[in-house]
UniProtKB/Swiss-Prot annotation:
Cofactor(s) the protein requires to work: FMN
CDD domains in alphabetical order: DUS_like_FMN
Sequence similarity: Belongs to the Dus family.
Protein name as it appears in the record: Probable tRNA-dihydrouridine synthase
Catalyzed chemical reaction(s): a 5,6-dihydrouridine in tRNA + NAD(+) = a uridine in tRNA + NADH + H(+); a 5,6-dihydrouridine in tRNA + NADP(+) = a uridine in tRNA + NADPH + H(+)
EC number(s) reported in the record: 1.3.1.-
Pfam families referenced in this protein's UniProt entry, alphabetically: Dus
Domain of life per record: Bacteria
Amino acid sequence: MDFKNKKWLFLAPLAGYTDLPFRSVVKKFGVDVTTSEMVSSHSLVYAFDKTSKMLEKSPLEDHFMAQISGSKESVVKEAVEKINALDHVSGIDFNCGCPAPKVANHGNGSGLLKDLNHLVEILKVIRENTNKKITSVKVRLGFEKKIPKEIAHALNDAPVDYVVVHGRTRSDRYQKDKIDYESIALMKKILKKPVIANGEIDSVKKAFEVLQITQADGLMIGRATLRAPWIFWQIRNNTTELPAVVKKDLVLEHFDKMVEFYGDRGVIMFRKNLHAYAKGEMQASAFRNCVNTLTEIKSMRESIEEFFNQEMLQSEVPLWVELNQKSV
């Protein structure tokens, strides 16, 4: 990955959202790097046949990172060895940012920010045992309080190719007013490796503001893509215009990919995606109530076609959606 000639654009891992069907849709809008949903090392080691489905990728994904979490070096080592057998995976991203209590309170995710020496040792284990070309880490600014300097200095000793920084602490969760790009800028000055800025990037204007403040080598965007997967195309072309795509066709394509990947179960799983796509449109509440009752492919597809009729759309402005607390 050459960070000298362009600013790289990354799709953030979002639990329950950034599966293969969604990533394949977003990839068409120019995102450079896609990342799997977070997978625990324990699940990879002890339930690989089931968990490995989360690490499948579409033919469109040329830079595909598998994101793993964990705190036990021996288990992380075994998980890395499992991923070694997956030739389509470009690299491993280690999660040190997940704020969910069931993750962080057990020393995983953002919980590792309380023991930076241990974090660095795990990153060394990953590098020493992976056969992939790329190793990266995603962090927050700290656990209870901000410690950007300490994290940056520690990661200078870690064998990673780039660092993704989410501009909040674990205790900040996803509070919009807590985002701190200045601390990302501070880490960028200290780190001797590329830095990717993440958090609250929901428009082209915001993207360029964050790049200016942080001087980051790229951007990682998550929640905004659920409503507007074309945001990467807009950033790459520095425009607020929309790409030549009919929203109904995009939603239907995503739905069809869900059914193809998950079977009939994909109908129910797609409800949350429809909630995001419909936000800001007239009759969105009624539509959500409707799709929450549908379980059959035919009836769901008909409802999508009716609601997302081009003439009904009132807004194509990227909007935020609320996610579950597992999302990073």
